[in-house]
Amino acid sequence: MLTSPLRQDHLVPETLMADASPIIRPETPPDLHIPDSQATVKVSIIDTTSYMSNFPMWAFLDPLMPGHEEMKGCDFSFIIEHPKSGNKYDTLLFDLGVRKDWENLPTPFVQGIKAGGCKIEVQKDVATILKDNGRDLSEVGGIIWSHWHFDHVGDAQTFPGTTDVIVGPGFKKAHVPAWPTDPESHIDEKAWQGRTLREIDFAAEEGKGLKIGQFDALDFYGDGSFYVLNTPGHTIGHLSALARTTVDPPTFIFMGGDIAHQGGEFRPTPYMPLPAEISPNPFNRILPRPALTCPGEIFVEIHRNKSRTEPFFDPTTAEGAWHHCAHEAKRSIDKLTEFDAYENIFPVIAHDNSLYGVIDVYPKPANDWFAKSWKDKTRWGWLNEFDPSFAGLAKASEP
C-alpha cells in the first residue's frame, strides 16, 4: 500500500518540552493491505441539517468529563458517485441523518425521547437537500445504513422503490419484523416495504475473505474504489466504508457512522500521540482571546490515565447505554485507530462537530480533503468540547 504513516516530526524522544514533560515519537502503524487501484469515487459530505441536544453523554462515553455531560451536535452523511460502475449503484448514499418529521418515528422511540427531555431539530431531510441541488432521486441506487438508529436511517420512503436499503450482517434476524408489526421496535418497517432490503454477508459475498486492516471488507464495485467494512459493536451489523478519493497520492475517506461518537474515543494513540503544541488551538472558536496554539500538557493533566498515547474515552458499559455491545464497539474503535494513523486517511464520524467551518459540504466534493489539510485542521478539534475553565485548561487562552 502506498499510504505512509502519519509523522509528527516535532515529536522527538531525546528532547523535552519547557515543562519537562517527555515528548513521544509516534509508533509505525501496521500495513492496512489496501489493494492498489486506479479507480476512485466522487464523495461529498452531506450536512443533513439535523441537530440533536440534551442527550446524556453517560449513555455513550466513559468517563464523563467536566463540561462534557451532554451529547449534542451535527449529523453527517455521504453521497458516493462511481463514474462507470455499470450497475444500479452508480450513486449511493451512506446514511440519511434524521427524518424531518421525526415525531412520526415508531411510538416507543418518540415517547422515550420526549420523556428523556432530548431535543431534535431538522431543517430538511436528505431527499430534499438532493432535490434542491438538482438531483434526480431515481439515480440513487442504494442507501447504506451504517446502522438502524434514528439519526442515520432518515426516511427511506422519500426515495423511489428502486432505491435499495443496504444493511449489515445480522440486521434481518435482529430487527425484522419491525414496528408496527413489532410494537416494541424502534425501527419503522415501512422503510424497506416495496423495495429491496439487502443484507451484506461478508462471508458469502464475492471476494469473501477480504480484509482491509483488521476489518472484514467488501470491494463494493469490484475495482478498489469503495469498500464496505464490518464494524460491529455500537449495534448489530454496524457498517463503515472506505472511499478512495484520489489516486496520486492515494487518499481515502473513512466513513465512520457511529463507530465512534467523539474523536476522543480514537485519539490519541501510540500512532498519534498528543503533541507538545496543538495547532490550531481547539478553543479558538469559543475563547475570547485564544492563543494561536495550545499546550498538549493541559489535556494530559485531565486525562484519566495522564496519558499522551491512550484515547480519552471508551464506549460506556453502563446499563441503559446506546451500545449493543460496548466491548465489541471498543474492538472496532481499536481497529479504526490503525486507519487514523495514516495521514492520507480521513475518518469522518457522523457527529464530529469540529468539522464545521473547515470542511466543504454537499454539493461541493470532498475528494480534495488532503490538499486542503482538513485532517490537519480538525485532528484535535474535538478537545474544544471540554470546559476551558476546568483545571489548567485556561492556559489555552492568552494571558
UniProtKB/Swiss-Prot annotation:
At the top of the EC hierarchy, this enzyme's class is: hydrolase
Miscellaneous comment text of the record = Fusarium verticillioides possesses 2 unlinked loci, FDB1 and FDB2, necessary for detoxification of antimicrobial compounds produced by maize, including 2-benzoxazolinone (BOA). The FDB2 cluster arose as a duplication of the FDB1 cluster with rearrangement and expansion by incorporating additional genes.
Q: Which family does it belong to?
A: Belongs to the metallo-beta-lactamase superfamily.
Describe the inactivation phenotype: Impairs the ability to of metabolize 2-benzoxazolinone (BOA) and thus growth BOA-amended media.
What is the protein's given name?
A: Gamma-lactamase MBL1
- Note the PANTHER family from the entry: METALLO-BETA-LACTAMASE DOMAIN-CONTAINING PROTEIN (PTHR42978:SF5), QUORUM-QUENCHING LACTONASE YTNP-RELATED-RELATED (PTHR42978)
Recorded GO terms, molecular function? hydrolase activity; metal ion binding
CDD domains to which the protein is assigned, alphabetical = metallo-hydrolase-like_MBL-fold
What InterPro entries does the record point to? Answer: MBL_superfamily_lactonases, Metallo-B-lactamas, RibonucZ/Hydroxyglut_hydro
- Pathway info: Xenobiotic degradation
What Pfam families does its record include?
Lactamase_B
* Binding annotation for Zn(2+) 2: 151-152, 258, 351
Gene3D superfamilies from the UniProt entry: Ribonuclease Z/Hydroxyacylglutathione hydrolase-like
UniProt record, GO biological process: secondary metabolite biosynthetic process
What functional role does this protein have?
Gamma-lactamase; part of the Fusarium detoxification of benzoxazolinone cluster 1 (FDB1) involved in the degradation of benzoxazolinones produced by the host plant. Maize, wheat, and rye produce the 2 benzoxazinone phytoanticipins 2,4-dihy-droxy-7-methoxy-1,4-benzoxazin-3-one (DIMBOA) and 2,4-dihydroxy-1,4-benzoxazin-3-one (DIBOA) that, due to their inherent instability once released, spontaneously degrade to the more stable corresponding benzoxazolinones, 6-methoxy-2-benzoxazolinone (MBOA) and 2-benzoxazolinone (BOA), respectively.
Q: Which conditions up-regulate this protein?
A: Expression is induced in response to 2-benzoxasolinone (BOA) exposure.
Under Enzyme Commission nomenclature, its number is 3.1.1.-
